[in-house]
UniProtKB/Swiss-Prot annotation:
HAMAP family: GTPase_Der. PANTHER family: GTPASE DER. GTP 1 binds at residues 10-17, 57-61, 120-123. Pfam families: KH_dom-like (PF14714), MMR_HSR1 (PF01926). Belongs to the TRAFAC class TrmE-Era-EngA-EngB-Septin-like GTPase superfamily. EngA (Der) GTPase family. It comes from the Bacteria. Residues 4-169, 178-353 form the EngA-type G domain. Associates with the 50S ribosomal subunit. GTPase that plays an essential role in the late steps of ribosome biogenesis. This is GTPase Der. It comes from Ruminiclostridium cellulolyticum (strain ATCC 35319 / DSM 5812 / JCM 6584 / H10) (Clostridium cellulolyticum). Residues 354-438 form the KH-like domain.
Amino acid sequence: MGKPVVAVVGRPNVGKSTFFNYLAGSRISIVEDTPGVTRDRIYTEIEWRNTKFTLIDTGGIEPYSEDIIMQQMKRQAEIAIETADVIIFMVDAKDGMTATDKEVATMLRKSQKPVVLCVNKVDRVGDPPPDVYEFYNLGMGEMQIISSVHGLGIGDLLDEVFEHFPEDIASEEEEDVIKVAVVGKPNAGKSSLINSILGENRVIVSNIPGTTRDAIDTHVEKDGQKYTFIDTAGIRRRSKISENIEKYSTIRSWTAVERADVCLIMIDAEDGVTEQDTKIAGYAHQQGKASIIVINKWDLIEKQTGTLEEYRKVVHEKLGFMTYAPVLFISAKTGQRVIKIYELIKFVADQAAFRISTGMLNDLVSEAVAMVQPPSDKGKRLKIYYMTQIGVKPPSFVVFVNDVELFHYSYERYLENQLRKNFGFEGTPIRFIHRQREKEN
């Protein structure tokens, strides 16, 4: 399996977000200023006892009325329960045990997931007030007592969480297996596509959004290449519930993206590119994943000459950060063009793993600089000394220059275009790191 997922669950204002932010620390950073690249502080990767896991913050609900609070809390907890391997159930020592705490406890017991009870806002962790022991009445077993504000007791809490991780935590670096995440909003046809690819109904399909409850791995071999398809459940927006809940609709897709080598970003041809599609695609881009934009239900679109190319143009306009991704028009229901998917997956996976020698790279840089002069500012011009590739998946390059402040985004984009023109890299993002050094004599 991949990284374990730990969700922090509890009623509003018990300190979930404070706890999350304490653990996240400086590891949360704003990435590219690009539409669709999520900035929500909703989850982060934590490492404890040499094991990485994903921590989900289910906080941030604004209480409007008692009824709405209950709806939001229940929906939030449901999603966290479905997603998580281990749940931290947080309560507030200062408020004491409430009716809402009891309802959450009942819900968690029914889940049969491992739950660690965490009593927050205790200033003297080693000598807690007697009142905290009333939380034993929740029937959740032993409690961990912490102060998120002061960082007290958190190590013991994480030790307890660690004990509940599945035993089969292991690297997924299997030999020559391409892991494919099929992601998209509910009812875009993710399960239908996998069924069409496999030629059999391995995944229950229904036109009711959210039918697929959890991520399902399907292993298949085609022409000597092994693939693992990860089908992710979609969670439908509920109009009567606060828009804060919408953030959780892509949690499963995010965890699938993290595990994947290639992402198939499913878009409903009739709906076009929606805001939710943009967020999911943006996350795949942010994570450096090779991606294919799959326009499903193409058989339902009324077509004229040029319809396909015009649609492709609109897709790349709306997903402007992902113009490198090929767009495939299919019908999972009829099987139209589905046969092309294996070939395209293998192609973009190879592109993401492609390496270029430093010599070839610097020949390209010399030619690029000769064609378009680097930018200058106040009489000082950018000088590129050399470039070398430092990684794959995604292809990553370090560029050594005289002044990183002169390396404008527009010139970086120009170099990226030259790389793509000469070496391909279709379907994969490219990363640049700028390094400044003095010119050698």
